Amino acid sequence: MRKFSPVILLPLMALAQPASAQMENFKTGPVFNDFGATAPVQMTEPLAKDAQFKIAFDVSTAADPDKINRTIESAARFINMHVAAGVPEKNIHLAIVVHGGAAFDLTSPEFF
């Protein structure tokens, strides 16, 4: 087994620190308050107030146990991010296609 020099690991540890510190900048809302957290982004070009979004999300991989499906959370994040940027919620239309192992993320044993 190869041993890694601490000198090699130091830059990796330095990169991980800012990433974890940035997580505190993420917040949920304005549409979904329990998931779909976003971080503020400095926009160089504002989004048009009448912009229409029609996006499809393909969800086939099951979530980790006791966690929300990452792709479904990405869809919630997409909505939160754009509404926070000023796009009216009524102008955002998502199709979330769920199949394969991800189908189990939509049900629970209590459902049956």
Regions found by a protein language model. Give the residues of each.
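Positively charged n-region of N-terminal signal peptides that target proteins for export
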Residues: M1-F4
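Bacterial N-terminal signal peptides
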Residues: V7-A16
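Boundary at the C-terminal end of the N-terminal hydrophobic targeting segment
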Residues: A16-M23
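N-terminal targeting signals for Sec/Tat export/insertion, comprising classic cleavable signal peptides
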Residues: P30-F53
